[in-house]
């Protein structure tokens, strides 16, 4: 069976991922912007969920992947914190202004990881030359790449994903992700030859608030702040069944 990684934003979601049969989670905050580094408190509590490999995204903000020296220092410190909290792996990504892998910065982050596994996240999908980028990541010692094949979804990017799996030839893991569901996970794995897959498997959960102050927003006034996304244990289970 292929390895299933679930993107989780809470302890509740981590438990749902585990109970649904996923082997690993990528712990993130602010999934609405693609994920940023979660708090130390969330990491520590997620670490208590037994039966899961815990990877944590290291991303100081939303937006692009061009980072200054202050953001780099923050990422290094976050990685050291992850190490102290017993995290299994970190998920990193940084590009140069020209759209190449920032190998200098990434080497610093890999060094800070100090033996934890290192996944390069979907910053890969924003680089200008994916084949060169893959060789760069292999050279600096990344263990895995999360990618949609530089397409809107992993299914749409299956052609490039297959080429990347062949190019990697066992030197690095190619993990398809983006738009993965129980309806297409098996198809993506078959089309690409990948042995791991990444999914969000989320559902909307309504707020328990009884009093709701209409007309006041804590963020985007067009978003529903009385609903949040959590991992759907039934969808995780369905993905697992489809790829078993």
Where are these regions (language model features)?
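Structural motif corresponding to the early beta-alpha repeats
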Residues: 44-83
């Amino acid at each position: 069976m292929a390895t299933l990684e679930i993107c989780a934003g809470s302890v509740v979601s981590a438990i749902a991922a585990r109970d649904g049969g996923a082997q690993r989670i990528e712990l993130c905050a602010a999934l609405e912007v693609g994920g940023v580094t979660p708090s130390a408190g969330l990491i520590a509590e997620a670490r208590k969920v037994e039966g899961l490999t815990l990877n944590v995204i290291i991303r100081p903000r939303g937006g692009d992947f061009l980072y200054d020296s202050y953001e780099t220092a923050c990422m290094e410190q976050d990685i050291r914190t992850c190490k102290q909290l017993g995290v299994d792996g970190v998920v990193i990504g940084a590009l140069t202004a020209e759209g190449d892998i920032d190998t200098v910065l990434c080497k610093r982050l890999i060094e800070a990881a100090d033996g934890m596994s290192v996944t390069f996240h979907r910053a890969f999908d924003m680089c200008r030359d994916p084949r060169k980028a893959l060789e760069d990541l292999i050279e600096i010692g990344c263990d895995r790449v999360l990618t949609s094949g530089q397409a809107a979804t992993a299914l749409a990017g299956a052609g490039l994903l297959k080429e990347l799996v062949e190019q990697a030839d066992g030197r690095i893991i190619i993990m398809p992700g983006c738009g993965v569901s129980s309806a297409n996970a098996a198809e993506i794995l078959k089309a690409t030859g990948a042995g791991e897959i990444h999914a969000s498997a989320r559902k909307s959960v309504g707020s328990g608030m009884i009093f709701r102050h209409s007309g006041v927003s804590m963020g985007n006034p067009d978003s529903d702040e009385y609903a949040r996304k959590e991992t759907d244990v039934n969808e995780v289970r369905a993905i697992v069944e489809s790829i078993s």
